Amino acid sequence: MNVSERLAASAVVPVVVLDDAKDAVATAKALLAGGVDVMEITFRTAAAADSIKAVAESCPDMLVGAGTVITLEQCKKATECGAKFIVSPGFDEEVVRWCVENGVAVTPGCVTPTEIMAAMKLGLNVVKFFPAGVYGGLSAMKALSGPFGGIKFIPTGGVNGQNIGEFIAAPFIHAVGGSWVCPKADIAAGNFEKITKLCKEARAAALGFEVAHVGVNCEDADAASAVCEKLNEAFDLPVKDGNSSMFASSGIEVMKSMFKGKNGHIAIRTNSVELAVAGLAKKGFAYDESSAKYKNGRMTAAYLKDEFGGFAVHLLQK
């Protein structure tokens, strides 16, 4: 995966503020333990450059970038120290142009049509939206995604563990940024286990897994109809007929053929099928590419290759 794909697969980009470079590697390891393999070390402190260098040299599994980059000098220093991506709070043409010309991934802050058009002119399709809470949040980005359908946003400021799922579910969101998963005070106090826990919680909230329905395989349409009639008779579950299956309420899908899975299938809803597929792949659970369905270029459904207790698993976009 390239840098942009790594950021998207992470879902959350921790904004890390370090007062002492000695804490950099421990923080990176805490993030990795929580399932987050990207981090943005900000130039808000004098320890930024040394911190980036320490992580780049000691944590090969961590994609480290530099944040709060507001000058070309900072940009060059960050890349010299090993930063693989640059994040700016605003749009600075000099910084962005240098990054583009030197093959460095860059995400400038863009909250207006003029700034977005300037970024597009330099070939960018992902921009930072900061501070998201101040500039209208999801509703503002949704409005901007109308004329700028090819642009995706990384909102920072106003995103937290309670609303991350809502952001990730939006098709115009690339990832989210925030410091809530690695509070400065916890870094200073050495509370790295807490940081790992916060990262795991953020990832879980971003994915938002929940059971959608259970699928039951039947030999044919008549058998499926008989099962649904029995469920309706016993439990008053409303029946809805479809082309390839019938539903008894929204929780039970009765297939009109012997479909995927020895015993049937389990459908799992998620805020992002693409994010779920990437995360599950890291755990060794691949998806069946031939089963993937797309809408407007976004994956909306896919089956995993593995069966669980004889059940196929179907991922669905919320």
Language-model features, listed with the residues they occupy:
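N-terminal beta-strand motif that seeds the catalytic metal site of vicinal oxygen chelate
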Residues: 3-17, 203-228, 261-268
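Conserved, mostly hydrophobic/aromatic
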Residues: 14, 31, 78, 127, ...
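Catalytic beta/alpha-barrel core
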Residues: 15-17, 37-45, 62-70, 75, ...
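Core segments of cupin and vicinal oxygen chelate
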Residues: 27, 44-46, 215-253, 276-282, ...
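Catalytic cores of alpha/beta
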Residues: 27, 71-81, 114-122, 139, ...
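Glycine-rich phosphate-binding active-site loops on the catalytic face of alpha/beta enzymes
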Residues: 89-95, 128-138, 172-195
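C-terminal helical cap(s) of enzyme catalytic domains, especially alpha/beta-barrels
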Residues: 99-104, 185-208
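Vicinal oxygen chelate
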Residues: 251-256, 281-318
